[in-house]
Amino acid sequence: MQVFETIGAFRAALTAYPTLGFVPTMGFLHEGHLGLVRRAKAENGAVAVSIFVNPTQFGPNEDYASYPRDPDRDLALLKEAGADLVFLPTPDVLYPPGAVTRIEVGGVANELEGQSRPGHFSGVATVVTKLFNIVQPQRAYFGQKDAQQCAVVRRFVADLDIPVEIVVCDIAREADGLARSSRNVRLTAENRQKAPALFQALQETAGLFRNGERDVDILENAMRAVLTEAGLLDIDYATVVNADTFRREQPCSDNALALLAVQAGEVRLIDNMPL
């Protein structure tokens, strides 16, 4: 496994790998990330992974400074998972002095997370586009947990004619249903006990949907009731949207997606489930 910190050195190594799968990460890796790496390895001649906590996708009052980091542990896990190339840049490598260009995505990027976290998807789109230009993969792998991010990436990849296939992989979960996330390590014991209620709320709504319920108000109220009963009261959103547009429809379509965002102490938890 080769590790690079500069764009030039990374690009020089690419000539040895005619087909490449790519997994962009912010580090502090968990089984969800490693599952993406293993799938990328199985479906491509080689796999590249980036580790970069991207400052431009964090808001002024968000957790950039406290986001967990452990690059030595990450590299050991990636070697074990079969990664071939790791790109580990510092912020000044990707955002050198004088860099001012940002990518703004409309449509799907304006909904939900786009409203709750202004500027977030512009930061994501900018850094992912830069990484695609540097890595030049045939395929890139993302987790379904960040469902709206996946939709945003697919949108700008299509709009900007970037020659990469976007592969979205199932959510990795703990035994109690909590979606795996690097931020979970920051949950207090009390909030970790409450956190599986997100998955339970999604299951409750999925059950109603399977039984024919299409009234969005009823589906959303069912999710909120489960969260409230568990003591998760700081709900950013608990909604059912069209999985393509991320807009709320009444009644909901068969192409529906239930999504949650909840603040549990200092940690913002998100989860979703296709209905």
Curated annotation (Swiss-Prot):
Keywords: ATP-binding, Cytoplasm, Ligase, Nucleotide-binding, Pantothenate biosynthesis. Homodimer. This is Pantothenate synthetase. Its EC number is 6.3.2.1. ATP binds at residues 26-33, 143-146, 172, 180-183. Belongs to the pantothenate synthetase family. The active site is at 33 (proton donor). It is found in: Cytoplasm. Beta-alanine binds at residue 57. It comes from Gluconobacter oxydans (strain 621H) (Gluconobacter suboxydans). GO terms for biological process: pantothenate biosynthetic process. Disulfide bonds: none annotated. It catalyses: (R)-pantoate + beta-alanine + ATP = (R)-pantothenate + AMP + diphosphate + H(+). It comes from the Bacteria. Catalyzes the condensation of pantoate with beta-alanine in an ATP-dependent reaction via a pantoyl-adenylate intermediate.
